């Protein structure tokens, strides 16, 4: 056979091999590209990932999101209220007081600890007992009540090292102008990062799941204090609301409501037709469930003015009431309480972010509190002005330094201005003075305004002016006009719109 004949027979085979090899190489290259993109994505910064997502939109999916709240009788909230009641008392008689007051409570016992620098002395025990009684712990059968609980105090003066770094205006040899400048540049009381968040899904710019959770337990407390219905209620309670969101991230319906409320042992075995404890417990649970559905939830709905939020209630939503079946033992007798353990309830219910610092018991020199309020003020006014539908603002401080070390903004891709988030952050820096002393001045944080914040959330509350009365064994009774929740005001909207050209 000649060479040409051999080649003629081999060529089709070689051509087939070349095609297979080419297919293999194309497949290998595709797998390599996928692996490389995955690796690059993992190494991208959050901002780069945001840009990648924006440039290559992926199909969204609906999801469920939950938030919880607790009542004023929850043991952790008892401690928050004690700490803030004491802080208010110090500020009422000395508005320059520096406080970091922690409280601890358990069966029949309260411990008050922390650091205070103030020229005034207050009666810690009287204020603590009054606060506990006002919450509703007034009966010995609760195993914790304001009249008989033991109270230990371990308050000492604030560290001189911290005070020296924070307040340089007290140094000797300063002129009046130097003293004024030093006071204006008061350093941050600690390092850390603080977050503020706002969303337009409710009228008060909170996540709807958290807003409804607060409303459930607050209304339950109102019913308990009125004493006309649900007479068996005790102070401790929790709620949780799960909301379904659609592909665009909009709330479409309530999926689940959970209510757990402490109650009297109001049905007991031994009465006619009830022979066992299990039967008594079953009847109690049935009664509480009926009352939650027929009394509590209708009262909650009457307080909602947004048709959009009312439309989330539906016939298919699940309502879980006291899922354990019985909740007689509760409050500090059931669980130990501690100041600062409900920071997600206090803020945004798991939306946005949290820097980890608690609020209650701290005066406004502590940026954990004051800067968290300021960033909420910024985020809420920015969303109300139309800059974005949703916004997270972060600031970070170094202890003893007045200006923040960083400012960060995230609009979650829901901005309405032709600016990057980093450019919006730069605008925030121009529009708002974020030094601690300036925050104190703008938000009027040297007022005795804090007890009202210690239950049912620090954010999304009503800004109003009230008169508060303070009395003490060591001072005459004092009436003070106080503006509450100043960080919820929408008084920067016009200024923001002008700055952003909206």
Tell where the protein language model's regions lie, with residue ranges:
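Conserved phosphate/anionic-ligand binding catalytic regions in large, soluble enzymes, centered on
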Residues: 70, 74-79, 187-201, 328-352, ...
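Short, positively charged and aromatic/hydrophobic N-terminal segments
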Residues: 3, 19-23, 27, 31, ...
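N-terminal, positively charged regions that mediate nucleic acid binding
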Residues: 41-47, 51, 56-100
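Positively charged N-terminal leader segments that act as targeting/secretion signals
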Residues: 4-14
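Glycine-rich, N-terminal phosphate-binding loop and its surrounding beta-alpha-beta segment
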Residues: 99-103, 108-169
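Glycine-rich, mobile lid/loop segments that gate access to catalytic sites or pores
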Residues: 66, 137, 145-329, 460, ...
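C-terminal catalytic subdomain
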Residues: 341-343, 348-392, 403-410
């Amino acid at each position: 056979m000649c060479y040409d004949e051999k080649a003629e027979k081999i060529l089709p085979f070689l051509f087939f091999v070349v095609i297979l090899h080419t297919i293999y190489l194309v497949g290998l290259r595709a797998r390599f590209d996928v692996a490389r993109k995955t690796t690059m994505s993992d190494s991208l910064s959050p901002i780069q990932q945001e840009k990648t997502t924006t440039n290559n939109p992926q199909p969204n999916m609906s999801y469920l999101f939950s938030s919880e709240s607790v009542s004023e009788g929850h043991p952790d909230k008892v401690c928050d209220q004690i700490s803030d009641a004491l802080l208010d008392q110090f500020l009422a008689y000395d508005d320059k007081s520096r406080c970091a007051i922690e409280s601890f409570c358990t069966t029949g016992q309260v411990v008050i600890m922390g650091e205070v620098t103030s020229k005034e002395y207050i009666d810690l025990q009287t204020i603590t007992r009054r606060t506990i009684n006002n919450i509703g712990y007034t009966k010995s059968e609760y195993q914790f009540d304001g009249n008989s609980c033991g109270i230990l105090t371990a308050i000492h003066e604030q560290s001189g090292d911290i005070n020296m770094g924070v307040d340089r205006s007290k140094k000797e040899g300063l002129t009046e102008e130097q003293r004024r400048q030093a006071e204006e540049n008061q350093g941050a009381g600690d390092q850390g990062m603080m977050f503020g968040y706002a969303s337009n899904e409710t009228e008060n710019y909170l996540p709807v799941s958290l807003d409804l959770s607060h409303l459930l337990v607050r209304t339950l407390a109102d019913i308990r204090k009125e004493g006309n219905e649900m007479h068996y209620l005790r102070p401790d309670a929790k709620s949780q609301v799960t909301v379904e969101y659609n592909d665009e991230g909009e709330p479409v319906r309530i999926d689940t409501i959970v209510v757990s409320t402490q109650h009297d042992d109001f049905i007991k075995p031994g009465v006619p037709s009830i022979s066992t404890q299990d039967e008594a417990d079953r009847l109690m649970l049935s009664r509480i469930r009926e009352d939650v559905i027929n009394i509590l939830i209708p009262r909650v709905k009457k307080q909602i003015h947004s048709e959009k939020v009312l439309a989330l209630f539906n016939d298919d939503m699940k309502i879980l009431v006291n899922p354990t079946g019985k909740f007689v033992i509760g409050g500090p007798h059931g669980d130990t309480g501690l100041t600062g353990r409900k920071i997600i309830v206090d803020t945004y219910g798991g939306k946005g972010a949290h820097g980890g610092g608690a609020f209650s018991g701290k005066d406004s020199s502590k940026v954990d509190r004051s800067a968290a309020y300021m960033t909420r003020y910024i985020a809420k006014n920015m969303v109300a002005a139309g800059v974005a539908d949703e916004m997270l603002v972060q600031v970070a401080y170094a202890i003893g330094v007045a200006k923040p070390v960083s400012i960060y903004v995230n609009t979650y891709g829901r901005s309405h201005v032709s600016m990057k988030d980093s450019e919006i952050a730069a605008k925030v820096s121009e529009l708002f003075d974020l030094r601690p002393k300036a925050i104190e001045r703008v938000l009027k944080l040297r007022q005795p305004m804090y007890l009202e914040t210690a239950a049912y959330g620090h954010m999304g509350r009503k800004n109003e002016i009230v008169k508060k009365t303070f009395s003490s064994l060591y001072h005459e009774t004092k009436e003070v006009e106080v503006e509450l929740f100043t960080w919820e005001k929408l008084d920067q909207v016009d200024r923001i719109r002008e700055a952003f050209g909206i």
